[in-house]
Amino acid sequence: MNDFSRSISDLTPERVTTAFDLAGHTTARSLGVAQGIVVRSRSIVGSFGAGLQTLFGGNITLYTSLCEKARQQAFDKMLADARKLGANAVVAMRYDSTEIGSGITEVICYGTAVQVTRDAGA
């Protein structure tokens, strides 16, 4: 049985890499760009709380939490998009973010959806 017969269910976070290839595997087919986009805004309460934290310096935990959640959601959406394309791995994964308005931020996670086969002896 080859990796392609299980390609949809095999795509797990462990098969996502920022490298241009997946160690121990050969890229058999490139399926195109997979992406996940999340647009988040700060709440008034969150902005007020974060504003208070800036008075004392250090890590602004409210914003850190918001950023971590947005990145995870974008990653999960990218995985879902790659699965739709039939991928069993994603290579060259990247994050990017842009402020598109006052307090509104877009986070995108993207990479190349691929089908890979395990190298002999790997």
Curated annotation (Swiss-Prot):
InterPro entries listed in its UniProt record: UPF0145_dom_sf, UPF0145_YbjQ-like
Pfam name, any one: YbjQ_1
Cross-referenced Gene3D superfamilies: Hypothetical protein apc22750. Chain B
PANTHER family according to UniProt: UPF0145 PROTEIN SCO3412, UPF0145 PROTEIN YBJQ
Family: Belongs to the UPF0145 family.
The protein's name in its UniProt record: UPF0145 protein Bamb_4477
Species per Swiss-Prot/TrEMBL record: Burkholderia ambifaria (strain ATCC BAA-244 / DSM 16087 / CCUG 44356 / LMG 19182 / AMMD)
Highest classification ranks of the organism: Bacteria, Pseudomonadati, Pseudomonadota, Betaproteobacteria, Burkholderiales
